[in-house]
Amino acid sequence: MPILWSGRREADQLLEEDPLALLIGLVLDQQVKMEKAFSGPYDLKQRLGNLDAAAIASMEPEALDAVFRQRPALHRFPGNMARRVQKLCGMVATEYGGDAGAIWRDVSDGDELARRISALPGFGDMKVRITISVLAKKFGVTPSGWERHAANWHTVADVDSEESMAEARDVKRRMKAEGKK
């Protein structure tokens, strides 16, 4: 199932083809519209020339911050997101040899997949569940027991049209409102 999250084919294609771009998009997917979050990896790549975990991890924090703040800013909170993305890239570079796809490649089961994703900077319980849903529904990553760790609500993993994007937005908005009660 193709990814239709950013409203821009080239940005969606990058998410489909580059595991690091996918993870960066998932990190950015908070407190901004989904289209903005999932366009972010493409825009970051355009500004940097490529998406290389080791290169991003080794950048001066102020330099990456400036890239995130360049207009239009990559996120509503560019400084915080630059730090989170840099930490994520640092872990991908050191723990997985710069290969973000190695995080889910050859996992033995859903428990291991959930452990690996939850160890990533910026990935709390909800984001882990959403990521596992995305990996299963969009990329066929379905190790034994993955369902126990997947989101049981309509997420970006279920988006395949404008209508399902609106539904995912509505679910996200309702969950946020319920969390504030």
Which ranges hold each PLM region?
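Alpha-helical ds-nucleic-acid-binding substructure associated with the helix-hairpin-helix region
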Residues: 44-119
